[in-house]
Curated annotation (Swiss-Prot):
Catalytic activity: 1-aminocyclopropane-1-carboxylate + H2O = 2-oxobutanoate + NH4(+)
Assembly: Homotrimer.
Source organism, top-level taxon: Bacteria
Gene that specifies this protein: acdS
Record-stated family: Belongs to the ACC deaminase/D-cysteine desulfhydrase family.
Any single biological process term in GO: amine catabolic process
Modified residues (N6-(pyridoxal phosphate)lysine): K51
Enzyme class: hydrolase
Record field: transmembrane: none
CDD domains cross-referenced by the UniProt entry: ACCD (cd06449)
Stated name of the protein: 1-aminocyclopropane-1-carboxylate deaminase
Length: 338
């Protein structure tokens, strides 16, 4: 497997830390050892997150093509668009962001705080669109690309989550390689890796990266899209493509893609009671914040799997904390009492 043949523009500090979640582990019985890999601490650009790791492999292409404007898309509280805006500012590029109404939630400040507020401060051209949530290419995004061209600019297209992009899976192949280096230092290997999945390329990259040492099926995706069939298809397709790109040496099949569908409801962006319990429990036991859209749902999934005895006793489980905390501000009413 050869990731090094792809150019990479450094946007992160380096390997992200792995933190023991000892108090949470003990609270859940102490039979499973939980750790977090802190992708939420990976960069100094507007709080970073998993998309920043992915963008390291997209940006060289944007620069090589002479593009002057990054154009991306997400929901109103999209972490993706905030990270794209930050990277564009760092590079001295323009940025156009399509922010669709992906979440069936209303709060007086939802479209004025958190991620979207940061994107505006970073200088992005933020365009609100009423369209609802779906996975795949969006007309509003294609219209934004065309508007840049019509104005004489040269856009670089970054789809939702960086996912449906030829280079979108590479960053998290690198994540797996990084984990292996850290495991050598720690003196043990993780038995399972838990990660949130929606647009798919984060888990897809992990599946390919961990397939290199036989652990593809130990990557447990927690669906947060509430459209798991679409998410599963996208993970599998991106993983197959990424495996070919990096020369994995074997095909990725549906057996390699594990996606737990139990924790994503009631719909994308709306927390359930378990999500909220997990957010508060992790915060109060570990001082680690998660969000209602993504990480709260994957944290809920991991907690319930421990409670249900789904991890064998003595397992070491690595939780991939992908970021997303700025979105908490958009849910201020839900958390008005903590």
């Amino acid at each position: 497997m050869n990731l090094q043949r792809f150019p990479r523009y450094p946007l992160t500090f380096g390997p992200t830390p792995i933190q023991p979640l000892k108090r949470l582990s003990d609270h859940l019985g102490g039979k499973v050892h939980l750790y977090a890999k802190r992708e939420d601490c990976n960069s100094g650009f507007a709080f970073g997150g998993n998309k920043t790791r992915k963008l390291e492999y997209l940006i060289p292409e944007a620069l090589a093509q002479g593009c002057d404007t990054l154009v991306s898309i997400g929901g109103i509280q999209s972490n993706q668009t905030r990270q794209v805006a930050a990277v564009a500012a760092h590079l001295g590029m323009k940025c156009v962001l399509v922010q669709e109404n992906w979440v069936n939630y209303s709060d007086a400040v939802y479209d004025r705080v958190g991620n979207i507020q940061m994107s505006r401060i970073l200088g992005a051209d933020v365009r609100l669109v009423a369209d609802g949530f779906d996975i795949g290419f969006r007309k509003s995004w294609e219209d934004a690309l065309e508007s840049v061209r019509a104005a004489g600019g040269k856009p670089y297209a970054i789809p939702a989550g960086c996912s449906d992009h030829p280079l979108g899976g590479l960053g998290f192949v690198g994540f797996a390689e990084e984990v292996r280096q850290q495991e050598a230092e720690l003196g043990f290997k993780f038995d399972y890796i838990v990660v949130c999945s929606v647009t798919g390329s984060t888990q897809a990259g992990m599946v390919v990266g961990f397939a290199d040492d036989g652990r593809a099926e130990r990557v447990i995706g927690i669906d947060a899209s509430a459209k798991p069939a679409q998410t599963r298809e996208q993970i599998t397709r991106i993983a197959k493509q990424t495996a070919e790109q990096v020369g994995l040496g074997r095909d990725i099949t549906s057996k390699d893609v594990v996606l737990d569908e139990r924790f994503g409801g009631p719909e994308y962006g709306l927390p359930n009671d378990g999500t909220l319990e997990a957010i508060r429990l992790c915060a109060r036991l570990e001082g680690v914040l998660t969000d209602p859209v993504y990480e709260g749902k994957s944290m809920h999934g991991m907690i319930e799997m421990v409670r249900n005895g789904e991890f064998p006793e003595g397992s070491r489980v690595l939780y991939a904390h992908l970021g997303g905390v700025p979105a908490l501000n958009g849910y201020s009413f839900i958390f008005r009492n903590g």
